[in-house]
Amino acid sequence: MYSSFHGVVGAIIVAASPDPITGLALAFVSHFFIDYIGESSIGTLKEAAIIEGGLFLVYLLACYLTSNPWLYIAAWVASNLPDLIDKPNRIIRGKPEWFSCHNGEGFFNYKGRKLGYPTLVQLTKEQTLTINIGSTLYFLLIACFL
């Protein structure tokens, strides 16, 4: 899934957790389970960057509406950390993706299977957009109560 959905799932996990450390650890682990949902491309790289960038700004706004904005920013980082490590490592250094859930190599690999691989559900472009936008707007709506 895209970073917007991972971030909202992480924020909800942190909000429901008994303490921030447990919440952030669970937000990190959630990434691998969320990747069982196979997203579809939401457009060209430029279109995806505009959509995800806009959703990230809405997420940041929602964070500042909460009683603890830095905790929810940390939740976004924790829930996206596998991709934040892998993507730049692959793009800049040409290294294979260690955490990638969309291949059979890397972290948690056992006989070609791993957390998040292979995907269990494949979403269409419209479903992917709906989940990303809808979850971010949901977080914006509930942020005042966190």
Q: Model segments located where?
A:
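N-terminal membrane-targeting hydrophobic helices
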Residues: 1-146
